[in-house]
């Protein structure tokens, strides 16, 4: 060690004792900053005096501390029992328990659901994932046996837990209840009682499928679901499911059913009325009787205007007009007609295509027995641009009815996340029990996805669910053996900015 006297840019003089090791200088002790040469000399003398009394001892203490530090670090590292990249598991376990799914006693369900949210894979790949990342040994055959058990004894409890949690968040009531259907296809053309070809919403015409109906709450939480035969007409799925849901969960009539016009027919509306349900439905205004259609087309087309048509049965037809929708209707029709004209010109249009599907509705057969595009039909269709109808028997004003109907996007998003992010389809199970169990696992996984989304919002994390999960995937927990105590100490490490950003989600006791 030696004393360094350094003149600073400001003209002051710094006096420090420094040491040199391995070509690097380290400050050992500072003695101050002098404003004059006299003060600098005085500090320099004090530093030399200190150095004469501490030089040997300092080197000895410093070397001793370094040796102890190395020894303690090596001992600590030698006692590390495990290092797990388990941030996702820790986070999703808390969400799983906070909803109440820990009431289902089988831990294998927890493993399957959390794996479905964090790393959706086949059941075989899930086994490997659980072992690699969480050190969980789960046998594949055990998974299949459990899926049979889930179908036989636990599916009802899972839906009950989900409904009660949603009720709790909604102040004890369900309120709005959105219904829609989608299709789930299989990587096979084989059929049975449940799996059959049908109209596919995924464009899979060759594969067998099932129809999935789902009820979703106003906040987007999944309430209940049912599977139907793959060839089932979607309009026949809604009433049985709502009746069953109401009976199973003792709902009373404190809810309003919201559904798209594609699910509606006169029979469904009649059944809703007879059951005493409140509803908001998409209307097929072009299918109304002549008097109603004449009234609709006589309405003044003012942007965002709403008009009520009272029916005798206490039902209202609400018609709204939107300039934005009118432009979209015209744009889509022009594109469709352009494709039709191109197909007609090339001779690809046949008589079999003269139907009411899509823009084929503008086709007709001429007197010369040729397929032509009807300009009269196009002109008639233009009259309806920008008009949209809604049917309701509620007391809500027209603007509120329209706003609630537009909440149907929550069901569409539920299907999009379940089928895409959570990879509910394609399905590779071929027995009814395991198909139902697979959908139940995905249903619970989506419930956890939605609850995590709510917690992210409450804690003002400012990230999407997917980005939070990505950050959690690199959070590590170490476990260290304490030989003297005969116990273990664990520590979850939040090392990066992203880790620190999501850290509030790892303590959900206040949410």
For every predicted segment, state its role.
Residues 1-107:
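Conserved glycine(s) in the ABC-transporter nucleotide-binding domain "signature"
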Residues 3, 11-15, 24, 94-511:
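Anion-binding and metal-coordination hotspots
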């Amino acid at each position: 060690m030696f004393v360094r006297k350094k003149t600073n840019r400001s003209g002051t003089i710094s006096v420090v004792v420094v040491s040199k090791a391995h070509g690097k200088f380290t400050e050992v002790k500072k003695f101050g900053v002098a404003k004059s040469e006299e003060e600098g000399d005085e500090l320099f003398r004090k530093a030399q005096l200190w150095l004469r009394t501490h030089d040997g001892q300092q080197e000895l203490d410093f070397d001793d501390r370094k040796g102890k530090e190395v020894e303690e670090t090596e001992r600590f590292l030698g006692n590390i029992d495990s290092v797990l990249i388990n941030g996702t598991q820790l986070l999703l376990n808390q969400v799983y328990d906070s909803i109440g799914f820990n009431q289902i006693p089988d831990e294998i369900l927890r493993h399957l659901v959390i794996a479905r949210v964090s790393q959706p894979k086949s059941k075989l790949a899930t086994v490997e994932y659980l072992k690699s990342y969480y050190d969980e040994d789960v046998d594949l055959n055990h998974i299949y046996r459990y899926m049979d058990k889930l179908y036989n004894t636990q599916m009802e409890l899972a839906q009950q837990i989900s409904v009660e949690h949603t009720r709790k968040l909604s102040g004890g009531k369900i309120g709005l209840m959105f219904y829609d259907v989608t299709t789930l296809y299989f990587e096979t053309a084989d059929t049975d009682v449940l799996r059959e070809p049908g109209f596919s919403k995924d464009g899979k015409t060759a594969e067998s499928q099932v129809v999935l109906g789902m009820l979703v709450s106003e906040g987007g939480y999944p309430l209940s679901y049912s599977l139907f035969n793959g060839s089932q007409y979607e309009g026949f799925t809604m009433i049985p499911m709502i009746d069953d849901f109401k009976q199973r969960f003792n709902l009373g009539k404190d809810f309003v059913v919201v559904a798209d016009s594609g699910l509606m027919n006169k029979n469904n509306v009649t059944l809703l009325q007879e059951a005493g349900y409140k509803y908001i439905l998409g209307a097929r205004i072009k299918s109304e009787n002549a008097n109603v259609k004449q009234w609709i087309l006589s309405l003044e087309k003012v942007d965002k205007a709403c008009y009520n048509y009272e029916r005798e049965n206490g039902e209202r037809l609400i018609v709204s007009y939107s300039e934005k929708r009118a432009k979209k209707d015209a744009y889509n029709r022009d594109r469709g007609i352009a494709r039709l004209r191109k197909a007609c010109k090339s001779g690809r249009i046949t008589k079999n295509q003269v139907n009411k599907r899509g823009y084929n509705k503008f086709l007709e057969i001429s007197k010369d027995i040729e397929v032509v595009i009807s300009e009269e039909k196009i002109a008639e269709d233009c009259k309806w641009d920008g008009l949209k109808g809604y049917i309701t028997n509620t007391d809500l004003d027209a603007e509120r009815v329209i706003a609630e109907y537009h909440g149907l996007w929550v069901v569409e998003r539920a299907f999009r996340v379940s089928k895409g992010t959570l990879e509910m389809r394609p399905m590779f199970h071929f027995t009814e029990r395991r198909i139902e169990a697979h959908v139940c696992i995905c249903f619970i996984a989506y419930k956890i996805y939605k609850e995590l989304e709510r917690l992210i919002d409450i804690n003002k994390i400012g990230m999407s669910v997917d980005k939070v999960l990505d950050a959690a995937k690199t959070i590590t927990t170490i476990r260290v053996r304490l030989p003297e105590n005969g116990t273990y100490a664990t520590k979850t490490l939040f090392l990066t900015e992203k880790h620190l950003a999501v850290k509030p989600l790892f303590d959900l006791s206040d949410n």
